[in-house]
Amino acid sequence: MLRKLLLLLMSCIIFLTRRSKAAAAASASKTLVWGPGLETNAVLPARFFFIQTVDTTGTNFTTSPGENTFEVKITSPTEPYARIWIQILDRNDGSFLVRYRMYASYTDLHVEVLLKDKLVGKSPYVLRGAVYHESCDCPEPDGALWEKNMHCPASFSQIESDLSIFQSVDPDRNAHEIIQRFGKSHSLCHYTIKNNQVYIKTHGEHVGFRIFMDAFLLSLTRKVKLPDIEFFVNLGDWPLEKRRASQNPSPVFSWCGSNDTRDIVMPTYDLTESVLETMGRVSLDMMSVQGHTGPVWEKKINKGFWRGRDSRKERLELVKLARANTAMLDAALTNFFFFKHDESLYGPLVKHVSFFDFFKYKYQINVDGTVAAYRLPYLLAGDSVVFKHDSIYYEHFYNELQPWVHYIPFRSDLSDLLEKIQWAKDHDEEAKKIALAGQQFARTHLMGDSVFCYYHKLFQKYAELQVTKPKVRDGMELVEQPKDDLFPCYCARKKVRDEL
């Protein structure tokens, strides 16, 4: 009798297990597919869209269904061999990020998402008309329409704040005053964009970083016609304008801001280049991070983690703190440049660690370098929780971040860091919730489309403040668009304008 009951129980367990597995199977018809990479006019260096796996009951997967669950094909009816590189990144939360880089322009692209040879969602998705690749010089003449196509927000609070201190901007005055104030002791780029052509004159000795700004301006002007505008970009680490709002400050664009300066903040050169070179020269970008988040939360190492160079005293103190508290912190220096290397205090230099391997650890410690640490966007995009200290420095998105929502704050002198790490250990679910909120923030606000939107809105709003006409000044040179002789594109927009 007992044996019969056991056999009956085992049969029930097997039946329920099979039923559970059947219910958990991914559904081709219910799985969701969306994103700007399915839209013709959302032109980016690497286009992207998302897949959310949904099972047959309509429930979203929250863990990976398997790295090779989906297949994506992108074809053009007019070109049998489309030059398009596709990558499917498993985000380990039931969703996938699909990114693709086009090396030529095509007409009527067809995007098929397949699950075991079955079309997923509303596949095939058809991008009607001319679909332009990154190097195609074909700007949308209507800035408002371009913003609509890119789904840009109506405003950015940091832009509103930065420009609020300027009632007007006088390019004629700035052309003399800014050079006189900053041109000799700092490195500046003086830009004029006229008829959507980029002109530049550099000031100062170390102007190599102009390549980042040049490249982005050329990319942006290939996509949308910018208003005529004249402005200065600070190529150094530190923001420059220390005058108060009441002291008639000069408008200087910088990659980093601070509480004691009045610079106009742009997305950092690091984030900007990673957008331009996604699936290109760089391996670390806002998309690649999402596919390399390491072990799931429960299997991550319960320690704080940091690697970097000695560009701030607090970084040295962090390493000393870690050496005295090895159970809580793993922090080490990879290079000495600013301070004397005292191995008895700071330990030996260690080898560089792949950024993706950072996410083997549950707690990511973000400490300023010379200014704000430009790694923060990538740390947020992982699925570890970020610890960020109080700082006078900020990037273009910091005012949208909330402590205890998107990251765990600690004091700049590190005096409460161990206490905060212990809190995270004792409140694991709350720490995980903060990690996921930070990750969602990065996915929503720091992707390539958001970076392009930010720059365009900044230039548009700044141009509206100009009270004299931007000019191509003496000594300026044209920054020419690169030629793509191998795969030149045919711009339908230019043909329409020529016929008007």
Swiss-Prot record:
Task: Keyword check for Cell membrane, yes or no.
Answer: no
Q: PROSITE patterns from the entry?
A: ER_TARGET, FILAMIN_REPEAT
**EC class of the enzyme, as a word:** transferase
Please report the organism this UniProt entry assigns to the protein: Danio rerio
Entry's Gene3D superfamilies?
Answer: Immunoglobulins (2.60.40.10)
Q: Which UniProt keywords apply?
A: Endoplasmic reticulum, Glycoprotein, Glycosyltransferase, Signal, Transferase
Q: What is this protein called in UniProt?
A: Protein O-glucosyltransferase 2
**What does this protein's UniProt record list under function?**
Protein glucosyltransferase that catalyzes the transfer of glucose from UDP-glucose to a serine residue within the consensus sequence peptide C-X-N-T-X-G-S-F-X-C. Can also catalyze the transfer of xylose from UDP-xylose but less efficiently.
Q: Where is this motif: Prevents secretion from ER?
A: 497-500
Which residues are glycosylated according to the annotation?
60, 259
**Family in the record:** Belongs to the KDELC family.
> What main location does UniProt list?
endoplasmic reticulum
Q: Which GO terms describe its biological process?
A: nervous system development; protein O-linked glycosylation via serine
Q: Could you tell me the superkingdom of the organism this chain comes from?
A: Eukaryota
Its GO CC terms are: endomembrane system; endoplasmic reticulum lumen
Signal peptide (UniProt feature, chain positions):
1-22
